Amino acid sequence: MTAPSCAFPVQFRQPSVSGLSQITKSLYISNGVAANNKLMLSSNQITMVINVSVEVVNTLYEDIQYLQVPVADAPDSRLCDFFDPVADHIHSVEMKQGRTLLHCAAGVSRSAALCLAYLMKYHAMSLLDAHTWTKSCRPIIRPNSGFWEQLIHYEFQLFGKNTVHMVSSPMGMIPDIYEKEVRLMIPL
């Protein structure tokens, strides 16, 4: 991986799928239920909650800042409009020694896609490396195909090359990193 290891947590606990998943020392991903759990937020010292949904309403707690990113989990939603502003915001919180929780409804597609954009921009990770790392921390991530197309375009903007490509499959266009998985699911 191309990211400096000092920015990433030591993997001393199992990856989480229901609670908060720690991605870096200052960035976590979760679903909407976990994002409204005061004990979970305080025990992980969360200072900023970024809600990437239109359907989840946050309970507002003192000493925590909130940012709403109103995007539906649909392939035609323009999540890319938020790649830079959200990555910049996460970085700004980190520079102030804060911790950010990025969440959507399930913690699978929208929040994961914005996490990948942040890792590419601020940790100089390729899209493939960012996905591999994030999936190791939160195994259920799976941005929708439209978000993948936007991430692939963003990776090219940042680095002038791509490490993930969209390919045709019986399920439609998918990122090539899912190709083997789809082949196992659909017998030819």
UniProtKB/Swiss-Prot annotation:
The keyword Cytoplasm applies. GO terms for molecular function: MAP kinase tyrosine/serine/threonine phosphatase activity; phosphatase activity; protein serine/threonine phosphatase activity; protein tyrosine phosphatase activity; protein tyrosine/serine/threonine phosphatase activity. Its EC number is 3.1.3.16, 3.1.3.48. It is found in: Cytoplasm; Nucleus; Mitochondrion inner membrane. InterPro entries: Atypical_DUSP_subfamB (IPR020420), Dual-sp_phosphatase_cat-dom (IPR000340), Prot-tyrosine_phosphatase-like (IPR029021), Tyr_Pase_AS (IPR016130), Tyr_Pase_dom (IPR000387), TYR_PHOSPHATASE_DUAL_dom (IPR020422). It catalyses: O-phospho-L-tyrosyl-[protein] + H2O = L-tyrosyl-[protein] + phosphate; O-phospho-L-seryl-[protein] + H2O = L-seryl-[protein] + phosphate; O-phospho-L-threonyl-[protein] + H2O = L-threonyl-[protein] + phosphate. GO terms for biological process: dephosphorylation; peptidyl-threonine dephosphorylation; peptidyl-tyrosine dephosphorylation. It comes from the Eukaryota. Keywords: Cytoplasm, Hydrolase, Membrane, Mitochondrion, Mitochondrion inner membrane, Nucleus, Protein phosphatase. GO terms for cellular component: cytoplasm; mitochondrial inner membrane; nucleus. Residues 19-160 form the Tyrosine-protein phosphatase domain. It is a peripheral membrane protein. The active site is at C104 (phosphocysteine intermediate). Its main location: cytoplasm. Residues 95-141 are annotated as: Sufficient for mitochondrial localization. Signal peptide: none annotated. Can dephosphorylate single and diphosphorylated synthetic MAPK peptides, with preference for the phosphotyrosine and diphosphorylated forms over phosphothreonine. In vitro, dephosphorylates p-nitrophenyl phosphate (pNPP). Belongs to the protein-tyrosine phosphatase family. Non-receptor class dual specificity subfamily. This is Dual specificity protein phosphatase 18. The lineage of its organism: Eukaryota, Metazoa, Chordata, Craniata, Vertebrata. The gene is DUSP18.
